[in-house]
Amino acid sequence: MGPVSVLPKPQSISTWEGDLAKMTHLQAGLSPDTIEKARLELNENPDVLHQDIQQVRDMIITRPDIGFLRTDDAFILRFLRARKFHQADAFRLLAQYFQYRQLNLDMFKNFKADDPGIKRALIDGFPGVLENRDHYGRKILLLFAANWDQSRNSFTDILRAILLSLEVLIEDPELQINGFILIIDWSNFSFKQASKLTPSILKLAIEGLQDSFPARFGGVHFVNQPWYIHALYTLIKPFLKDKTRKRIFLHGNNLNSLHQLIHPEFLPSEFGGTLPPYDMGTWARTLLGPDYSDENDYTHTSYNAMYVKHTCSNLERECSPKPMKRSQSVVEAGTLKHEEKGENENTQPLLALD
């Protein structure tokens, strides 16, 4: 099952076809449905696309304190899409993107897949990335929290691996428009592990993902979260924007509520889905290339979206799965019964992103 088609109303077909005819090279490769979605949801207009980009670029002079290391059309466009073509908001996000990197120089030193810290995090499944997209065309990212071996991976390196993964994925214009979903499985995540999630490092993650990256997040789903994760969530709430809070869903062990938002056919069996269990090494092999190894140092430094697209299936056949801890929420698909939603649980579906 592919992404849901968003077809124009009959009376708008001629206008819609005209927009496709005027499509710029920046929209090349997008499906007609995605182009129409960008027009309806993001206010993307091919007639003024280059003017929109230039107006954001013209604002750079107002922030001489920031080094804008990349200002090409394709790069600025992703910030416009992330902010629904509100130019001032798009520029603010662009400035925060580079300012975050200036303020956290150590995080972005040797910022590539073969950096030892990033490589370890990737191999341990941080993050997991499902091959197929959901029914809205969104990419699904997974985090199995209990797999965090604190003697092996620092939280900062896990965050770096997530940010690097997003940098690779956001090169795909379809994902700039359709966005992402994040599912965090807290099964077997101990209180001792949780005690390492200090306010300062959580704030660092929120600033990097919420305030400084041009991605549209359609939802962050907590599954099997213990009471102390609820407490941590209360702790970080002041750092979250209202829009972000509305997109955090606390499912507990109620996978039925998860399936109301993400159909089981797009989920691995750990989340009651119909897909096979997730192989924790899949995304690491995609980024690291055919020389991926759990044990040997990796020396190949290049990666790009085209390489990811064309080699992923071959690598999956060549490499065996890496055994990791699994979620306790494995159930047979279709056997879940409807449960009453808890008063404090956000389980409203998101049909469109703000």
Curated annotation (Swiss-Prot):
Keyword tags: Cytoplasmic vesicle, Endosome, Golgi apparatus, Lipid-binding, Membrane
Name of the featured protein: Clavesin-1
Membrane among keywords: yes
Superkingdom assignment: Eukaryota
Record's comment describing the protein's domains: The CRAL-TRIO domain is required for targeting to the membrane and for binding PtdIns(3,5)P2.
Cell compartment(s), UniProt: Golgi apparatus, trans-Golgi network membrane; Early endosome membrane; Cytoplasmic vesicle, Clathrin-coated vesicle
Positions of the CRAL-TRIO domain: 118-279
Compositionally biased spans, kind Polar residues: 345-354
SUPFAM superfamilies in alphabetical order: CRAL/TRIO domain (SSF52087), CRAL/TRIO N-terminal domain (SSF46938)
Tissue and organ expression note: Expressed in brain with no expression detected in non-neuronal tissues (at protein level).
Gene: Clvs1
Role this protein plays: Required for normal morphology of late endosomes and/or lysosomes in neurons. Binds phosphatidylinositol 3,5-bisphosphate (PtdIns(3,5)P2).
GO BP annotation list: lysosome organization
Subunit-structure text: Forms a complex with clathrin heavy chain and gamma-adaptin.
Region span, Disordered: 317-354
